[in-house]
């Protein structure tokens, strides 16, 4: 059975040096058809699958399901893009040193996604 000091020691071991502290962002975006405001599905033309493939063309590395047939996530620069149950696209940012870096990362991601949206006819 755990003792109080076991728990305290566990948390003390997790304390990082001030110079090793990092921050990261996570945010989800609903992707909607511009003309109908309907949520995109994975398989439809210019849908979530095609969006992910566009990201692959921009240097993101795909991660596949167990059957190695369906892209379920992307990775680049310590960042990842994943899908939520409602087909929302989530950016999990890299571990960065300051808020300015997270701002740059978020703006880069949103620009890439909005550029694809211009081509495919969706909005966030």
Predicted features by range, described:
Residues 1-124:
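Terminal catalytic/cofactor-binding subdomain
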